[in-house]
Curated annotation (Swiss-Prot):
Transmembrane segments: none
Basic and acidic residues: bias regions: 96-117
Amino acid composition bias (Low complexity), ranges on this chain: 123-145
Family: Belongs to the eukaryotic ribosomal protein eL24 family.
Subunit structure: Component of the large ribosomal subunit.
Protein name as it appears in the record: Large ribosomal subunit protein eL24
GO terms (BP aspect): chordate embryonic development; cytoplasmic translation
Superkingdom as given in the UniProt entry: Eukaryota
Function per UniProt: Component of the large ribosomal subunit. The ribosome is a large ribonucleoprotein complex responsible for the synthesis of proteins in the cell. Plays an essential role in early embryonic development.
Keyword Ribosomal protein: yes
Amino acid sequence: MKVELCSFSGYKIYPGHGRRYARVDGKVFQFLNAKCESAFLSKRNPRQINWTVLYRRKHKKGQSEEVSKKRTRRAVKFQRAITGASLAEILAKRNQKPEVRKAQREQAIRAAKEAKKAKQATKKQTTQSSKAPAKSAQKQKIAKPMKVSAPRVGGKR
């Protein structure tokens, strides 16, 4: 049994019922009854007519028992350890007072500067000790005679 849908009202049309309307452009419409057909031909909007399925869908009639509100999944904050720092360390750092944090930062900067100075001092000592014997061993460079080309005469053109 082939059940069709009314092109205007959206109701089911059972075999032996309804009317078929074929437009000049070849499009075929099925109507439940003359009421639907006349409303369609007078170009009425089925969304604005109370008894049509489209109106009921638009104004959410008779759907409340079928569809319960969809639950959306919320993102939940979750704390976990990061590589190189355990969760306890992270929480301890977060709970520190700003003064303590500032003092630690300054101390770390001071230590880094001292390490840099020490490194530069050792570098200087090594360069001085290696340069001293090298100076006496150096010979004076002899200036090479440069070839002087003949002066150019005339312009480019």
